[in-house]
């Protein structure tokens, strides 16, 4: 969703070029916002009846509440996402702690601890036994440097020892949360990039942030309002079935109804998930292996934790999130009387 990913798209665009963007998930919305800001005319098409893709909110009649379809969390190091929020006027819609801290609870043993990075790039905090995860030593953390020299095909499990205490209590939760892939299958290089850009920059870069009033209120609705104010065309219930070509140029968008003709000079951006892109674009190959994330939302008659227990577990008052080990779910999100559990990979 970042500006960097848009640079190849923006390169070579003539000012006021009309750009057709297929897909109104966050990639498509971000692309549309940046192009509209640059003065281009934007037409946005979405297969569903609402924007946001996998990042949206909806009203659940059984719970009697508006919930998010997933428990999405941003790191403060995600400058591209924060810039996107600023552009659409939602820069103040995220909440998070004043300092980065991640409380964990082990469901098997009842042990609990807090991962609290230091301020600088060098992790001096691992020298303090009181700040290390229970049962771990300095060498367990330094072993993570092996990820920096991992080959292109190396997996996290190739670089780190699954028998080390840090595996279950840090490496596995981090890998699953960041890559939605088990460590034995996840790319070591990709995990190193996550570490380098977050924990490797000090605590100010890895403060967790969530949408205060829901994903739609922060990431989707303000973007649609911004695009409408810029004169963008927004079309819902438009599923791209294929492209019509004139020579080697895309000339028509087939939506199974009235087609949309692309004029000479128009540009096309396909911002679809792999399955949708492969179905619409001839000759395109995409990944077939996917891993869903399951979220369970439970409404309780009263808040589940009292003030004393929150303090004991180290939960932040503004962002009560608890990492879980030793069970099926990896994360517990608490918002008043609403509890959400996340099961990844």
Put a short name on every predicted segment.
Residues 52-77, 137, 143-148, 197:
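Glycine-rich active-site loop/strand segments that organize a redox cofactor
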Residues 17-44:
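N-terminal Rossmann-like FAD-binding beta1-loop-alpha1 element of flavoenzymes
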Residues 36-61:
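Glycine-rich FAD pyrophosphate-binding loop
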Residues 2, 38, 238-345:
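Mid-domain catalytic core of redox enzymes
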Residues 1-19, 37-38:
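Extreme N-terminal leader/targeting segments of oxidoreductases
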Residues 27, 50, 275:
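Conserved Rossmann-like nucleotide-cofactor binding loop
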Residues 78-196, 205:
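Mobile amphipathic helical/loop "lid" adjacent to a hydrophobic cofactor/ligand pocket
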Residues 194-257:
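Helical element adjacent to the flavin cofactor pocket in flavoenzyme catalytic cores
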């Amino acid at each position: 969703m970042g500006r960097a990913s848009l640079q190849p798209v923006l390169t070579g665009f003539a000012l006021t070029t009309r750009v057709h963007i297929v897909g109104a998930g966050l990639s498509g919305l971000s692309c549309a916002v940046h192009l509209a800001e640059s003065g281009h005319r934007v037409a946005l098409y979405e297969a569903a009846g609402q924007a946001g893709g996998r990042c949206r909110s909806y009203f659940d009649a059984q719970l009697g509440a508006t919930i998010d379809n997933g428990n999405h969390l941003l790191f403060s190091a995600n400058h591209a996402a924060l810039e996107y929020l600023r552009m659409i006027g939602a820069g103040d819609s995220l909440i998070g702690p004043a300092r980065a801290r991640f409380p964990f609870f082990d469901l098997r043993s009842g042990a609990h601890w807090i991962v609290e990075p230091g301020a600088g790039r060098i992790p001096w905090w691992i020298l303090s036994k009181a700040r290390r995860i229970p049962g771990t030593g300095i060498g367990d953390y330094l072993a993570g440097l092996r990820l920096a020299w991992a080959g292109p095909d190396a997996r996290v499990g190739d670089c780190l020892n699954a028998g080390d205490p840090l595996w279950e209590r840090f490496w596995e939760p981090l890998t699953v949360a960041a890559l939605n892939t088990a460590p034995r299958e996840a790319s070591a290089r990709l995990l190193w990039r996550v570490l380098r850009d977050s924990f490797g920059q000090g605590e100010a870069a890895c403060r967790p942030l969530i949408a205060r009033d829901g994903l739609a209120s922060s990431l989707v609705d303000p973007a649609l309002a911004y695009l409408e104010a810029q004169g963008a065309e927004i079309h819902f219930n438009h599923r791209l079935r294929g492209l019509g070509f004139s020579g080697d140029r895309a000339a028509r968008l087939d939506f199974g109804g009235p087609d949309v003709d692309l004029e000479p000079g128009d540009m096309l951006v396909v911002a679809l998930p792999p399955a949708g892109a492969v179905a619409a674009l001839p000759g395109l190959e995409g990944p077939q292996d996917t891993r869903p994330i399951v979220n369970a939302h439970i409404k309780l008659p009263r808040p589940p934790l009292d003030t004393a227990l929150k303090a004991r577990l180290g939960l932040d008052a503004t962002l009560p999130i608890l990492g879980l080990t030793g069970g099926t779910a990896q994360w517990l999100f608490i918002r008043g009387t609403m509890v959400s559990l996340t099961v990844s990979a």
